Every structure is written in structure tokens, then in C-alpha cells.
Amino acid sequence: RVVSVGADTWGVDYVLMSRKGELLGLPYAYRDARTQGEMERVFRKVPRARLFEQTGLQFLPFNTLFQLLAHQRQHPDVMATAHRLLFIPDFVHWALCGSEVAEFTIASTSQCLDAQQRTWAVGLLKKLGLPVKLLPEIVPPGTRLGRVRTSVAARIGLEGWEVVAPPAHDTASAVAAVPTADTGKLTWAYISSGTWSLMGVEVTRPVLTARALEVNITNEGGVDGTYRLLKNIMGLWLVQQCRKAFEARGRTFTYPELVQRAGEAAPLRSLVNPDDP
């Protein structure tokens, strides 16, 4: 019998809310170009190595840290008005039960978290001029957040259900579902394929070495106190964009048709590195 509900989503994106619980505008998608140049501005204040040593996250221009800096530079009035930042799954939980927390695995995608302390990197954020008052309490996956609001339950048929935070980052949930008993051991690896392909291993402490920085890998939160040491690899987004481009030209293909045509095409006629900036 199903008795609880929780949400997981992609990482890094967020909403800003007022003290009255109102959305201060719609959330930006992480592919929005507003973060251009933010990473370089940060490195002028905090060396790249120091930032990795504290946050353990690979450097991607859409990390929440760079999104927030862009938000503050472009819309300082909104940032000044904001009372709370909620990541997308945390916002769903708020809509369901009114909780204002950040589940650990989704918070770990932000580059605003101290990887070793598992708390917000307050000193770093203050140095960069970001308002730490926006940041909610961090809770581990499995935390009971409350009952579904009566008004919501009546509309969607969840009377009596409890909201429980899952690993709210979708990859963390996927890795948690791997059928192994060797939690946190280097006896297995995973590839989670979707818009992105995430390849990595599960470890018990973040890997913050110079070599990890050099190859730009990331330490994201997992379940049971683990970390997901992984690399972001461009995934099926390429196929999605190909299909979209074909449709714009009046040619509609299903995904199985695209796979079939790709298999029939002459191999290695072109070589594209989708991660080349």
C-alpha cells in the first residue's frame, strides 16, 4: 500500500520565494545563457583549486552558484526581496506540504555546499556577495517532511499521505536503485543515461585531489552518507536536438526510427566532440 510521496528532478535549478510564499518569477532553465562569464568572475575572487577543494564539484557554467551570481547581477531587486531559495524538487515538496528545506543530494549539485562538512559553504558564499539567508536547512534523504496539505490532497487524491524526501536529485535516486549490497565500495560502477550520461562510482568520502580537479570530475551526494564520484557526459540531448531540428524542417521521426537510421549510416564519417566549449 502506497502511503508516501516524494519528488526527484534534475539538479542545479531553483525558485526564489517571498516571505509570503509567493514565487518571485518563473525559474530559469540551466541552459539559459545568462551565466556566461560568471565562472571567470568567480575565479578572480576565489582560485579554481580552492573552490574545488571546498565544494568538490566539477566546473560547469550552469551550476547553481553561477546562476545565483548571474541572478544577483542582472536582477538585484529580486534577490533583495527573496526570502527563500528552493531547488525544484524541494519546491514540489513545499507545494505538497509546506516544507522549506533542501534535501542533501539536490543541494550537493549547487556548488554552494561544503563537500566535507555537508553544510552550506557560508564563508565562500559571503565572499562572493551572495545572501546566505536564502538557504534553507539541509536534510538527508528519507526525512519525513509532513502530511500532504488538505487542500492539495482533496484535489489529487492523496488524503493521509506523508511527504518523504527521496534522494531528490534524479541521478542519486537512480544510483540508489542499483541492485548491489556493496554501498560505498569500489566493486561496481554505474552509467545513468538520459539527457546526460553520468558515469561514476560510489565512495564514502569526497575525492578532492589535484588529479580530480585536473580531470574535472564531481562529488555529488548519495544515500547513506555516500558520495557519487562521477563525470557528466553529454547524453541523449544530442538525439533530442536532432529530432527537434528535423521537425523544424517538416520531417518527423520517432526515436526508434532515428536509431535505425543511425545504424544504417556510414560509420565515422564525422567526428563531433559535444563537450568542446
Where on the chain are the PLM-derived regions?
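A conserved helix-loop-beta module that forms one wall/lid of the active-site cleft
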Residues: 128-141
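N-terminal glycine/serine-rich phosphate-binding loop of ATP-dependent small-molecule kinases
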Residues: 1-25, 53, 81, 137, ...
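Conserved beta-strand and immediately adjacent loop positions that scaffold enzyme active sites
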Residues: 13, 109, 189
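Glycine-rich phosphate-binding loops at beta-strand->alpha-helix junctions
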Residues: 140-148, 168
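Short, well-ordered beta-strand elements within core beta-sheets of diverse protein domains
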Residues: 110-114, 135-137
